[in-house]
């Protein structure tokens, strides 16, 4: 069951908490379906469909699964490159304070409720996989995606992300830890090489991912960058050795969009799903014929997708618009996050020349008359937005 944790209010029951199938239960169901699939069907499954979907297989009664960004709420994307996505979109979605603000609350319980609300909004839109939380370290202030992340401190990130994962997945929505790993800049992000030694990797970059994995995260997205000279999305060192063996991750691994280049390396790396479609694996059948990729490699990839699919009961999932009834709770959670994340400085020594007699205050800057929000795939527009200048005039 899920609870209202804001402001220490009494626990408020919304509905029964989602219970996934165990690894062994899901593995057994995946095996039973895999034996019925043709090689062509397996190849089609390991490449994304229409940019944001796990491909459906109607012959085997497997429905499509829609994915959506991001960490601070649901990005409403009605259309993308002539692909109609309106079937899976919300009438509105709550724009929560950025995760960097959530981290500033130092409140893991609030992280749970924040994420639970995001998960409920995913369910209202029929979204099975949330492409968040952003789990990277805030290493460079120039990184344009820092607002999606939980700061620079490994311990704080780990504590907040652990509860975030639990909150999202309590609703039956998959949480996706991203971007694995050491993805600290978006400048030349497809060519950026993060050179990181073992100690720094394990002390700074991995703890938050490990916490999310231990909390039960069902998906990990690999990153655009190279780690020590290897593209993360097709690196056996990154995926098989670090993610799967060292961190113990056993569920779905997907690429970031258009981030892999070598189908043979991808199939051998431990990667499962190439997004947004099969590019490196476009000619997987030829790679198999040439002996560069084994059918067993494709079987492993397809089985991992199916295992996650069945664990999260996507074969039973339906859009649940009754969650719109919880949006007022979500608004209160967003407000509480903003309140707890604020750092208020006292005006000692009258550093700001404002007194009780002051009648006029100059408010200037780019965001006086518009909202300060992060952009790109993580942007959440929200609704009933209020501008700073309008509030100060009241």
Residue ranges and their predicted role:
Residues 2-394:
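Glycoside hydrolase catalytic-domain context in secreted enzymes
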């Amino acid at each position: 069951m899920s609870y209202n944790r804001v402001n220490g209010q009494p626990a408020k029951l919304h509905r029964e908490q989602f219970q996934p199938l165990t690894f062994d239960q899901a593995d057994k169901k995946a095996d039973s379906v895999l034996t019925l699939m043709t090689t062509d069907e397996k190849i089609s499954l390991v490449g994304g469909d229409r940019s944001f979907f796990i491909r459906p297989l109607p012959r085997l009664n497997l429905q499509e699964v829609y994915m959506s960004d991001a960490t601070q709420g649901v990005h409403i994307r009605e259309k993308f490159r002539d692909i109609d996505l309106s079937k899976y979109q919300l009438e509105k979605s709550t724009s929560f304070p950025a995760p960097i603000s959530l981290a500033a609350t130092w409140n893991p319980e609030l992280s749970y409720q924040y994420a639970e609300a995001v998960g409920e909004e995913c369910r209202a839109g029929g979204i099975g996989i949330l492409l968040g939380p952003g789990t990277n370290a805030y290493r460079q202030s120039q990184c344009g995606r820092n607002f999606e992340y939980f700061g620079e401190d490994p311990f704080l990130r780990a504590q907040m992300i652990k509860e975030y994962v639990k909150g999202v997945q309590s609703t039956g929505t998959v949480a996706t830890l991203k971007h694995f790993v050491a993805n600290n800049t978006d400048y030349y992000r497809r060519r950026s090489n993060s050179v990181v030694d073992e100690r720094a990797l394990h002390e700074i970059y991995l703890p938050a991912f490990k916490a999310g994995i231990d909390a039960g995260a069902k998906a990990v997205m690999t990153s655009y960058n190279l780690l020590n000279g290897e593209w993360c999305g097709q690196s056996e060192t990154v995926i098989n050795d670090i993610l799967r063996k060292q961190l113990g991750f056993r569920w779905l691994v997907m690429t970031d969009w258009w981030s892999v280049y070598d189908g043979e390396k991808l199939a051998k790396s431990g990667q499962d799903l190439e997004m947004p479609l099969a590019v490196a694996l476009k000619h997987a059948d030829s790679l198999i014929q040439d002996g560069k990729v084994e059918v067993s490699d494709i079987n492993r990839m397809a089985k991992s997708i199916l295992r996650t699919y069945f664990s999260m009961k996507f074969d039973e999932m339906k859009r649940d618009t009754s969650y719109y009834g919880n949006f007022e709770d979500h608004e209160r959670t967003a407000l509480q996050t903003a309140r707890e994340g604020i750092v208020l400085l006292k005006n000692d020594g009258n550093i700001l020349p404002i007194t009780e007699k002051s009648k006029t205050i100059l408010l200037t800057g780019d965001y006086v008359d518009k909202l300060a929000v992060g952009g790109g795939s993580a942007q959440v527009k929200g609704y009933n937005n209020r501008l700073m200048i309008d509030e100060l005039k009241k």
